[in-house]
């Protein structure tokens, strides 16, 4: 039987809206009664009826007919339920006018949670997912449990790719594996680090108290985990101030463990580019802001390295990315104006030098904002950082107003979508894009809670509802988060470790209408764009995981814990 209910499979916050949908086409298979005559009940795990409600045709400002999934949605709302408990949704007949008669239950959902604890648990799981992506170090059983593994891919003495025409060896130890593969990249690592540093910067007290580290649930705090990647970044800084592009195996690994991969082929440094150098400069300048209270020496190292990289980029503004994708991802970027904006804004937050003003004003003219961050388009870092700094109120005001415009556009798009999301095309990494849009709302919510009568917190949480289960394919897209989580991600560690369960806390890319993996034998549940997700290991187009998708989800969860 198809599941007729679309809801957040993990939970809802007590004081937040609690909206779910039913699909009329699926209900028709269960009853002859029209949807308007059906009722729903919210029932606690002890059997207490907490709420009884009816359905409204459509969803949000949408009429309810979802083009991308061929579903007709009706809305149920149990926001009145504030009691913290585990509960389920029952779809019932014969409630009205049948006093003393137990209603006929047509369908009952799996249990979910009303409470605050689930958000903290998901935050910890997301942060720990980066620990599981660590390269070059042992993952101890006391922290990693059944996913423990020996140190592999030390990368502490590796050569340079032949296309670099460079002799010698380099220490590139540490860092995170990027996604489902064993490459380590500065560009995609940069947007991930920058996003997590924003979370640290904005939620320092609350997040660090939740994620103190040293436990099974949380081996390292958010700042400590990010520092592991930053130390790798610092090793990728060349003597001249340029930053190497990536560490890559010679060829694509099969689905084996890091240990087996390490024995089977060499790993190499590949490329040095303006884009990687500016990603480094922006990330390290942000790191200086985050760590200066706790570790002034490390913050100083970061800022000095950022300055060196920025100077190299000024002298080398058009050094291309290495156009080699044999064994690792490309991350090609032919426009670095947005990275210059990011690097300058981060520098300005540390050192508001007079010489930066005209450059930042020009950056703001030529780098209009996007609805969310992306590894190729990083200008929102510039806008966000300027909105948060207090050195110049004029720049701050302009940045905030600009981001408010983005937030309003996101909410407008959500209101018009059947499922309440703001993307208009399901692409590779759609869950990352949705999470990044939610992050824009969460950041603007820090200084403005409503725009044109629409609450930013409400619409931010609606995006997360999609990620955690309220979607056409009925998956909670984070591994280990719910009964419906992916179990076969396109993730080499999860398939090479001999453990049945995948590494927890990983966000799958999600629905992708382009289906680039059809030749791999992937079977999708339907032909429509909204059904383009398959929990199958070959599905790199929909079921791969990546640190740049986990990072915005982590940041949003951190900001929700802050509030």
Language-model regions: role of each:
Residues 5-99, 103, 110, 128-190, ...:
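Aromatic (Trp/Tyr) and acidic
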Residues 112-117:
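Short beta-strand edge segments in extracellular beta-sheet folds
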Residues 122-127:
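Extracellular C-terminal loop/segment signatures of secreted glycoproteins
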Residues 198-228, 266, 286-303:
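Short coil/linker segments at helix-helix boundaries
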Residues 220-242:
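Carboxylate/His-rich catalytic cores and anion/metal-binding grooves
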Residues 234, 311-314, 361, 365, ...:
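HEAT/HEAT-like alpha-solenoid repeats
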Residues 307-311, 317-318:
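Hydrophobic, small-residue-rich alpha-helical packing segments that form membrane-like cores
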Residues 371-375:
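Zinc-dependent metallopeptidase catalytic helix centered on the HExxH motif
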